[in-house]
Amino acid sequence: MNEVEVDHKIYQMPPRDGFSVAHFITVADVERSARFYEKIFGGRILTLGNNEGAPGFIQIANTWLIVYFGGGPTADKPTVTLSVPADPDRVSSFMNIRVADIHACYELWRSRGAEFITEPKKKYGETRCYIRDPDGYIIEVGQTDPGITYG
């Protein structure tokens, strides 16, 4: 394991007690998306899923990503339809990955096929860049400047 790889610890999904946070994205092809997150970020596919109703679950570092093909309203969300982004340049939310060495991550993930919008740029106390996934979602990759801590 090198400095940009993540050691997959045991994080329970579903949690045995309390709760955990998972990020859900609507995708055009469940397997394609699961394989992308596995290849680029070293994610561990817990359940591959399919386009016939089974979501995919991928562990990435200390969180989970759920990929699913979407669909129309259901009994528990009667007015909501899930769909992939119509315009990948207009977003309302995105995944944010915090890293210890952005330049090493940029080079590694680019070598694995990640499509970066730009190279890393300094802004607001951090250096960051963005990746597009196969459905057009953007993923921010950021490294906080030395000396800044949260929490």
Regions found by a protein language model. Name each.
Residues E140-V141:
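Short glycine-/small-residue motifs
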Residues R32-S33, D101, C105:
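Short phosphate-engaging motifs
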Residues M1-A22, R44-I97, A104-R132, T144-G151:
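Vicinal oxygen chelate
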Residues S33-E38, W109, G136:
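Conserved active-site tyrosine of GNAT-family acetyltransferases
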Residues V27, N96-V99:
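Short, solvent-exposed loop/helix junctions and linker helices
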Residues V27-V30, N51:
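Conserved beta-strand-loop-alpha-helix junction that forms the acyl-donor binding cleft
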